[in-house]
């Protein structure tokens, strides 16, 4: 009887890993400035979740996520403050979004686009994910600027404003015909919403406890925030883009 269960050279076993399902409680945080034409909406967002704590690590066990993505969260907060400081009501409603669950697969932004009753009124989305580091110390002004290729105005805005306001940025312009990957911009691009995404590339501290605030290039964060405020101002007020 025992020989019946022996594995022979011509025996093949197929094992399929189905995974373990876990119920998560996630919370997106949204703020809004009502526009003169509230039937049209633009959104600026960044994910605020990170990796938490790993008690199995020796030494530093806390994943602080200074670049990924406190840098992006700070930009959204400052843009909201700047919109209010103008004292002007934008033409379109502006939503300021802080997404949960990005590190688990864009869960927060996916849930939003699937459940937001006015999603068809969203005309554009601007995303921040990791905007505070140098992947090459010889190029401290480097930033990758992804945008929907069918909307060349997005590229023109940044080029013009860098010259006009003397912003210390050296963008790598990457128009993308289907910008569905990388970060929360993908959730919006997949349903045809035009996007802009600021990103300063990877670095050795990515998803490591060493992603500390003292390694942030603060001048870069400030310049990206200034440029993206202008992006959002145009997105909220220009008739067409």
Regions found by a protein language model. Give the residues of each.
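Sec-exported extracytoplasmic/periplasmic mature domains
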Residues: 1-3, 78-88, 114-118, 159-167, ...
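Soluble metallo-hydrolase cores and metallopeptidase-like ectodomains found primarily
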Residues: 1-65, 81-88
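Short helix-loop-beta-strand segments that form the rim/entrance of peptidase-like active sites
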Residues: 59, 82-105, 120, 128
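Active-site alpha-helical elements of protease catalytic centers
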Residues: 65-80
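His/Asp/Glu-rich mid-to-C-terminal helical/loop segments that flank catalytic regions of hydrolases
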Residues: 85, 202-241
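Metal-dependent peptidase/peptidase-like ectodomains
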Residues: 99-200
């Amino acid at each position: 009887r025992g020989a019946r269960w022996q594995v022979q050279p011509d025996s093949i076993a197929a094992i399929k890993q189905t995974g373990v399902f876990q119920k998560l409680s996630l919370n997106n945080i949204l703020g809004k400035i009502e526009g003169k034409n509230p039937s049209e909406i633009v959104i600026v967002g960044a994910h605020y979740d990170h990796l938490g704590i790993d008690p199995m690590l020796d030494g530093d066990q806390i994943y602080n996520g200074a670049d990924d993505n406190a840098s992006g969260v700070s930009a959204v907060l400052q843009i909201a403050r700047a919109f209010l400081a103008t004292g002007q009501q934008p033409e379109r409603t502006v939503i300021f979004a802080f997404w949960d669950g990005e590190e688990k697969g864009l869960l927060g932004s996916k849930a939003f686009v699937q459940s937001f009753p006015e999603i068809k009124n969203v005309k554009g989305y601007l995303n921040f994910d990791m905007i505070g580091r140098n992947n090459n110390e010889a190029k401290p002004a480097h930033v990758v600027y992804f945008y929907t290729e069918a909307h060349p105005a997005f590229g023109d805005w940044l080029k013009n404003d860098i010259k006009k306001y003397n912003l210390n940025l050296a963008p790598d312009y990457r128009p993308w015909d289907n910008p569905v990957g990388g970060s929360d911009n993908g959730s919006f691009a997949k349903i045809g919403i035009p996007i802009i995404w600021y990103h300063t590339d990877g670095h050795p501290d990515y998803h490591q406890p060493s992603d500390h605030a003292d390694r942030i290039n603060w001048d870069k964060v400030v310049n990206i925030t200034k440029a993206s405020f202008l992006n959002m101002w145009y997105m909220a007020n220009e008739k067409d883009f």
